[in-house]
Amino acid sequence: MNHTKLKLSAVALTLALGLSACSGESPEKQVQSAESEQMKAVDVDKSMPMQSIESTAKRIGESAANWQIAQFGNLDYIPESHRAKSENAKFWIQASFYIGLTRWIDATDDKQLESFVKQVAEKENYELILERPYHADDHAIAQTYLWLAERAGVQEAYMPTKEVFDMILSKPPQVGLNMGDSESSSGKYHLEGNCQLRWCWADALFMAPRAWAQMTKVTSDPKYLEYGNKEFWAAADYLFSDEYGLFFRDSRYFDAKSDNGEPVFWGRGNGWVFAAIPMIIEELPEGHPSKDRYIELYKKHAEGLMALQKEDGYWPASLMDPDKVRTPEVSGTGFITFGLAWGVNNGILTDQRSKDVVEKGWSAITKAVTDDGRVNWVQHVGKSPDPVKESDSQLYGTGAVLLAASEMLIWNK
């Protein structure tokens, strides 16, 4: 196989020209009062004409994808603490962007963007990060490789991932899901705890389960989906609160309280899971026995989330304590808006309230994207509600916006 010799930055520049002619601190320390910076007023339309939504989705999706791609090789706007990892295409930060980008490609059939994704995957030799092969974060890029395998029928696109998954199946992890009972490790690719050999934190349910379902689809071997399905439900049953209809980030937050005395439910953490559920459902074989269970969880989570949307259309970084971080937060809002829009578009959420919440969320998202496509107001890498500035931008935030735009492109059709 002839691999491209282009550097990622060069690939990005070529495409852009053609198209445009987790810290270890305790929850108490992580959940701090928001910065005193005043949020700019955000005017959110109560309703948007259908033609306006479709045209806005097309504009936002195209500009966000193009802007983000043009930044590769020049990610100076990202804090130095996470810049190197953001530049690594195999790491979850960039992989989350590709999950949104491939969804956008499916919606638009954009061949130039598809070519870009192929070149990135070839440059990485379709490989995962192997320093911690069990870690869900490092399975996120597999979703793009498997997307390419299914779309183009290229066997080499999924073989390295298959080798890793087969190893995991041969030596399945024998640890519990309690983050507090496990030991952390240091290093470039660290573990918050040994439980991360499994999917013991909310983010993991976005990063890994869909890839295991995709592997079954491309290989026709049910063992991958069986493992992914089992581990998803182990984590979901452990982290989901039936009382609130929300996911705890991990076990360390079961008893944590925000400043107002309410439980700590992280906006983006819930967004990760809520965006993942529709994409997992789509990968299930016809008649899969767990489909109804996924839809039931989706509905419970949707109800919990819809009740917490702010008047400005955003979901707060701290879902039960909106005063903790008063500024917009677009990554969580993007993931949640995508999930809700998917439910409306697929006839699962049929009431007018759901439609209104989606349109309000989408209108808020559009206010956070600049004319040239930069996605602002994105909370940086973390695991709990942290302060957000307007200039904060990250690849997964763009991925979230692309997911939402892909559904708004077909809104109510």
Curated annotation (Swiss-Prot):
User: Could you say which residues form the signal peptide?
Assistant: 1-21
Covalent lipid attachment of type N-palmitoyl cysteine occurs at C22
The subcellular location is: Cell membrane
**Molecular function as annotated in GO:** hydrolase activity
PROSITE patterns attached to this UniProt entry: PROKAR_LIPOPROTEIN
Give me any GO biological process, just one.
carbohydrate metabolic process
**One Gene Ontology cellular component annotation held by this UniProt entry:** plasma membrane
Q: Gene3D superfamilies this protein is in? A: 1.50.10.10
Coiled-coil blocks:
none
Q: Where is the lipid attached (S-diacylglycerol cysteine)?
A: C22
EC nos = 3.2.1.-
Q: Name one Pfam family in it.
A: Glyco_hydro_88
Matching SUPFAM superfamilies, A to Z?
Answer: Six-hairpin glycosidases
Topology class, membrane: Lipid-anchor
The family classification in the record reads:
Belongs to the glycosyl hydrolase 105 family.
Sum up the protein's function in the record's words: Glucuronyl hydrolase involved in ulvan degradation. Ulvan is the main polysaccharide component of the Ulvales (green seaweed) cell wall. It is composed of disaccharide building blocks comprising 3-sulfated rhamnose (Rha3S) linked to D-glucuronic acid (GlcA), L-iduronic acid (IduA), or D-xylose (Xyl).
Q: What protein does this entry describe?
A: Unsaturated 3S-rhamnoglycuronyl hydrolase
